[in-house]
Amino acid sequence: MQRVALVTGANRGLGLEIVTQLARLGLLVVPTARDADSAAAVAHALTASGLQAVPGVLDVTSDASVGALQTAVLGQLGRVDVLVNNAGIGHDFGRPAAGADLALVEDHLRTNLLGSWRVSNAFVEGMVANRYGRIVFLSSGMGALSEMGGGSPGYRVSKAGVNALVRMLAAETAGANVLVNAACPGWVRTDMGGPNATRTVTEGADTAVWLATLEDGGPTGGFFRDRAAIAF
């Protein structure tokens, strides 16, 4: 059976690399983006290379957008087997928590935490019913309590929340062959990471792709960097 993989924020950077690698592994992929033309361009490039892709329009902060995507994808493809929650923002790097702009913190929570939660809610029940699912959250060591420092409060707190959500969903889907994990890609040369970052997008995507294609009985409820477990 060909698996269906949906990747959020797949029009550039890590998301584009992840969706491309999954397509090359033989999955039918759904690259999503807020802009319909951007999502369609990714899908067209993949299909032109002989891969299978269906574009999806998605704003993770909108209930209506997520609901419309859910209806469209399930109506056309029947199910989603793999979900990679990649869409995210990082707009307060280096800013202090003391005196933080709380509206900016809320922006990070709305996209990074609630956005990925909203999309997961749309598809996790189907995964449980089908007795197969892989949910991957793109997180960060900056959200690990074990590594927590100062600065970047919206980004850090939102990713700490993502890590907590991973643990909850993994516990709630235990025994259903739904594996829920977080991936830390490291500091990657993307629009967010900047040109001085130490990793390529290929390196940054590797752990997420590995988690998205885990064999049955693989780990769940974990946090991984370079395919090795790290502390929350």
Identify the function of each model-found stretch:
Residues 2-30:
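Canonical Rossmann dinucleotide-binding motif of NAD(H)/NADP(H)-dependent dehydrogenases/reductases
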Residues 84, 119-123, 165-166, 211:
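Hydrophobic positions on the long internal alpha-helix
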Residues 89-90, 96-109, 117, 128, ...:
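Catalytic loop of short-chain dehydrogenase/reductase
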Residues 175-178, 182-185, 194-232:
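C-terminal helical subdomain
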Residues 36-37, 57-68, 102:
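The beta1-alpha1 cofactor-binding region of Rossmann-like NAD(H)/NADP(H)-dependent oxidoreductases
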Residues 51-52, 72-85, 91-93:
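A glycine-rich helix->loop->beta "capping" turn
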Residues 25-41:
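Conserved glycine-rich Rossmann-like NAD(P)H-binding loop of the short-chain dehydrogenase/reductase
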